[in-house]
């Protein structure tokens, strides 16, 4: 089976969940104050909202939502919480798009392996781990705009640069496990270079002086 990087998490969903995914994606891209989606469980809605943001790092301006529902309706009203005003979102989107394109231009003529090394080196040298864990540090605007990010923000920055350079890449996630002392999810990347799949964890590397962690998936 061939893995698909574009809308990777979308393809993990069932038919009804895909409809919600699409509605969330469109609503966030249009920066709507609220929009209607199929009534699913709170857990499903939360997971889908998260999946949209994993597949689409360019949606960096909303990390959570609330919703209203009515007992006799098959729909719920989903209300995104935005990190910035509408005008600021437009401004930041243009800035991030320009930033990504300028960086990609520096590597567009390189081989796949060289492109991956370029992205790796850029993140390791220019992004610091944000111990304060600000909300924007989970997004590309933290990594590419402010030079600080947590694992999620770094992994999304890697993905959006890989997407721009035509490299297969997804954001991979581990589960939280409080019973074993694992309080938070960890995010890294799975990439495909010359037909082979690798794990790439730039967060690990920023803590270990740029030591590369790129492990082939057998």
Model-assigned labels for residue ranges:
Residues 1-98:
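Linear, non-domain "peripheral" regions
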Residues 76-78, 142, 146-148, 196-202:
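Short, well-ordered strand-loop elements centered on a beta-strand within folded domains, enriched
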Residues 86-144:
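Secondary-structure boundary elements
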Residues 102-106, 145-146, 175-184:
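Intrinsically disordered, low-complexity coil segments
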Residues 130-133, 137, 148, 169-180:
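Catalytic cysteine-centered active-site loop
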Residues 135, 139-145, 149, 153-160:
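Conserved active-site-adjacent core of cysteine acyl-enzyme catalytic domains
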Residues 153-218:
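Hydrophobic/aromatic-rich core segments of domains that either
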